[in-house]
């Protein structure tokens, strides 16, 4: 095998893409299966001059990235299913006020805690239309691992 070829999971691709794009602020709460994004960023982001904050919940995570984005930071948080539900009010605020934020929703297979450590595609509708108000939401999704890098 070519030594330049490396097999990695979608969450790992997301981390590499975010760092490559200049991510300099991450706030998150550990919730599987999105923990695989927070874990490597915890050690790697500070080495690149960025800030990593472990928050008390998903609501605070969303509030933190909104605040950091307002100061000019490139921001991201990662969550899954029920955590994404908790972010909806703050997400709606960010959309209405046009505050740039990247929210990675690593979707679980099945409803809410159906398969908490596996992934699925059931949250696409919530990503697109989950908040209150009448506004447009950009909700890109990756259909294959090699799409994760440009999507992130």
Model feature map: region roles:
Residues 1-129:
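Thiamine diphosphate
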Residues 118-152:
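Conserved thiamine diphosphate
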């Amino acid at each position: 095998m070519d030594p330049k070829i490396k097999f990695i999971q979608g969450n790992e691709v997301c981390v590499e893409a975010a760092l490559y794009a200049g991510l300099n602020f991450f706030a998150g709460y550990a919730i599987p299966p999105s923990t695989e994004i927070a874990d490597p960023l915890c050690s790697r982001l500070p080495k690149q001059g960025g800030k990593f904050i472990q928050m008390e919940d998903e609501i605070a995570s969303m509030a933190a990235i909104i605040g950091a984005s307002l100061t000019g930071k490139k921001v991201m948080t990662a969550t899954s299913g029920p955590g994404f539900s908790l972010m909806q009010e703050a997400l709606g605020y960010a959309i209405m006020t046009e505050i740039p934020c990247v929210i990675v929703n690593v979707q679980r297979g099945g409803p809410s805690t159906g398969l908490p450590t596996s992934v699925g595609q059931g949250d696409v509708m919530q990503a697109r239309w989950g908040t209150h108000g009448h506004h447009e939401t950009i909700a890109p999704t990756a259909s294959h691992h090699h799409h994760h890098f440009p999507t992130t």
